[in-house]
Amino acid sequence: MKILLIGYGAMNQRVARLAEEKNHEIVGVIVRNSEKHYPYPTFEHISEATEADVAIDFSNPELLLPLLEEDFNLPVVIATTGEKEQIIDKLKALSTDMPVFFSANMSYGVHALTKILEAAVPLLQDFDIELTEAHHNKKVDAPSGTLVKLYDVIESLRETTTPVYDRHETTEKRTQDEIGIHSIRGGTIVGEHDVLFAGTDETIEITHRAQSKDIFANGAISAAEKLVQNKNGYYTFDNL
């Protein structure tokens, strides 16, 4: 498989290393600063990478969104999480002409976490829910795209929900429709996501901890391997 990388930060550097270990080939990268030295050819547009079988994106909305507006026909695996709604809308429009894949988190374990949550929420309607995520001190967005995805699952299964991001000025007791959302940034934490169900005299906690960023890179490569075998359409972990 010949892969075009969109972005060449820490994540796509891992994708490159792991993909080559699996005997895939990196044909080039799309980056904002093409004057910097890279170990692969640099491109400005997806359509320029004529040898590529698939593109894997770990970048940012500023780089990605303009590329998605261009004329190209190449399967794409997208992991950028900022401006999620815009990205998904554009991918769904592109999906009539090519297979596209999107996930806010490329870990299959996190996908499993959402499925566990889908089963737990209906069983625990009387429990309060608090969501917490923790990441390294270089992560710029908060809350994480994964935590937003977990909230979306809860919102779809409860009659009313209200996300609460800050309680330091609150002087009233918690309401049952509140979903507390908390972000921690520090050190080199790869990624932790925790769902706390708090009931009367008991709590249930569901946690996913990433122990290496390789799980995200391998998840993207695995998605790409499957995507190139599929017909045009919009894919997630649910249907790939």
From Swiss-Prot:
<dbReference type="Pfam" id="PF05173">
    <property type="entry name" value="DapB_C"/>
</dbReference>
<comment type="function">
    <text>Catalyzes the conversion of 4-hydroxy-tetrahydrodipicolinate (HTPA) to tetrahydrodipicolinate.</text>
</comment>
<dbReference type="InterPro" id="IPR022664">
    <property type="entry name" value="DapB_N_CS"/>
</dbReference>
<feature type="active site" description="Proton donor/acceptor">
    <location>
        <position position="135"/>
    </location>
</feature>
<dbReference type="GO" id="GO:0008839">
    <property type="term" value="F:4-hydroxy-tetrahydrodipicolinate reductase"/>
</dbReference>
<dbReference type="GO" id="GO:0051287">
    <property type="term" value="F:NAD binding"/>
</dbReference>
<dbReference type="InterPro" id="IPR022663">
    <property type="entry name" value="DapB_C"/>
</dbReference>
<dbReference type="GO" id="GO:0019877">
    <property type="term" value="P:diaminopimelate biosynthetic process"/>
</dbReference>
<dbReference type="Pfam" id="PF01113">
    <property type="entry name" value="DapB_N"/>
</dbReference>
<keyword id="KW-0520">NAD</keyword>
<feature type="binding site">
    <location>
        <begin position="79"/>
        <end position="81"/>
    </location>
    <ligand>
        <name>NAD(+)</name>
    </ligand>
</feature>
<dbReference type="GO" id="GO:0016726">
    <property type="term" value="F:oxidoreductase activity, acting on CH or CH2 groups, NAD or NADP as acceptor"/>
</dbReference>
<dbReference type="GO" id="GO:0050661">
    <property type="term" value="F:NADP binding"/>
</dbReference>
<feature type="active site" description="Proton donor">
    <location>
        <position position="139"/>
    </location>
</feature>
<keyword id="KW-0220">Diaminopimelate biosynthesis</keyword>
<dbReference type="InterPro" id="IPR000846">
    <property type="entry name" value="DapB_N"/>
</dbReference>
<keyword id="KW-0457">Lysine biosynthesis</keyword>
<dbReference type="InterPro" id="IPR023940">
    <property type="entry name" value="DHDPR_bac"/>
</dbReference>
<dbReference type="GO" id="GO:0005829">
    <property type="term" value="C:cytosol"/>
</dbReference>
<feature type="binding site">
    <location>
        <begin position="103"/>
        <end position="106"/>
    </location>
    <ligand>
        <name>NAD(+)</name>
    </ligand>
</feature>
<keyword id="KW-0560">Oxidoreductase</keyword>
<comment type="pathway">
    <text>Amino-acid biosynthesis; L-lysine biosynthesis via DAP pathway; (S)-tetrahydrodipicolinate from L-aspartate: step 4/4.</text>
</comment>
<keyword id="KW-0521">NADP</keyword>
<dbReference type="InterPro" id="IPR036291">
    <property type="entry name" value="NAD(P)-bd_dom_sf"/>
</dbReference>
<comment type="similarity">
    <text>Belongs to the DapB family.</text>
</comment>
<keyword id="KW-0028">Amino-acid biosynthesis</keyword>
<dbReference type="GO" id="GO:0009089">
    <property type="term" value="P:lysine biosynthetic process via diaminopimelate"/>
</dbReference>
<feature type="binding site">
    <location>
        <begin position="145"/>
        <end position="146"/>
    </location>
    <ligand>
        <name>(S)-2,3,4,5-tetrahydrodipicolinate</name>
    </ligand>
</feature>
<keyword id="KW-0963">Cytoplasm</keyword>
<feature type="binding site">
    <location>
        <position position="136"/>
    </location>
    <ligand>
        <name>(S)-2,3,4,5-tetrahydrodipicolinate</name>
    </ligand>
</feature>
<protein>
    <recommendedName>
        <fullName>4-hydroxy-tetrahydrodipicolinate reductase</fullName>
        <ecNumber>1.17.1.8</ecNumber>
    </recommendedName>
</protein>
